[in-house]
Amino acid sequence: MPISRRNFHLFLGAAALGGATSSIPMSAGLKTAADQKGSAPYFFKDRTFETIFLTSLGRAYHSGGNPGKILYLTRQVKDGDFESAFTAFRQAGDEARGQAEESLAGGHRESARQAYLWAQNFYDSATYFADGSADPSRFLPAWEALYDCWVKSLPLFDPPIEPVSIPYEGTMLRGFYMRGKSKERQRPLLILVNGSDGSLLDMWLWGGAGGTARGYDCLTFDGPGQGYALWKQKLYFRPDWEKVIGPVVDFALSRTDVDPKRIAIQGISQGGYWVPRAIAFEERIAAAIADPGVTDVSTSWTATLPPPLLALLKAGNKAEFDSFLEKALPPASRATLNFRMRPFGFTSYFDTYKATLDYNLRDVANKIRCPLLITAPVNEIYWPGQSQQLYEMATSSSSKKLVEFTEADGADLHCEPQSTGIRDLRVFDWLDQTLSVKG
């Protein structure tokens, strides 16, 4: 059947989100799966806006945001207006960074640390609206401000977060080592793996804060296609994530303070694919968490493609596939899709969509042997049903658990954005028991 622009916009959905590979997916005016599903909104009818604001609010649990300011911003932003959202969050970030610098100059280190975390929250939120705004080029300066605040916050933690360099295929990945409260000479370690466009702040808030408080050391990093590795090192996604995690584990084992028998790993958002893929090959991992389980990344790109476009993809018709998308997408949506393609390292729509087909666990999930916890948030929009699929596919896991998060918990939606507390409780209680940690 012919593909009209109207039908294309109705069908494209999550594909325009670039696979919804982060804890905070976005679009630029397209109708998406996010518009059709989910719990009743608290603030915005536009599911993109709702998700980003809920995530921003959820970050406050571990001092990553000022709830009153976030609630104030919900009244300053027009539903669906990307320009107003970008401006509001960017200005809030500048304001919080100014507060941090003023506190630091006055010797108030804890106040400065918290304000730098607030600034990161606001700057990161701004980046998700940049591509649908009047000037998408403002993304990179906002990201650079976010990263600058992260770096400046590190020495203000107690103990300080330690910047580390992880050898990786002839270069170095930037990593960050978070010391836990345990006084053991060798401590359990939780490796924190991000999605595609999550911030380092989220690695602190969705694992680091809860882990260090319970006696775990934590290690996070920007891997290929993520953060600094993407924007400054030009390293791109790869489906064989065990080639990334192997060097990270090598680095961890080079430290005398890491207990080699108690190394765990957690992946959030698309990290729910990275981690199961890695542990299918990496046998030095003692336990793993996938939040949520992702068995096939490509479905969030291809599931809502109209059948004729899907046929072009399967037939390998690159020229026609690219030509249609280039003509059919309005400027804001094209900017969003082009941005979402960058972590894959391609400029062709066809090449990117085709590459996503390699990101699946079909032939490897049955090789997972370590204990595995898989979160299953109700109203998971981007990979619905895949947590259950991963649970069923991991037939060789020595112990596996599927943990549901519901609306009644206040913890539904992709990566439980507004409920890091209940998430920490369930994830770390399981991990404590699995690794015999007294958290």
List the model feature ranges, each with a label:
Residues 7-28:
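N-terminal export signals
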Residues 381-386:
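Conserved alpha/beta-hydrolase "acid-adjacent" motif
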Residues 408-421:
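Catalytic histidine-centered segment of alpha/beta-hydrolase-like enzymes
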Residues 368, 374-376:
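Short beta-strand/loop motif that positions the catalytic acidic residue
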Residues 280-347:
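Hydrolase active-site cap/lid region
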Residues 143-182:
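N-terminal cap/lid segment of alpha/beta-hydrolase-fold proteins
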Residues 395-411:
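Catalytic histidine neighborhood in serine/cysteine hydrolases
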Residues 236-256:
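Alpha/beta-hydrolase active-site loop
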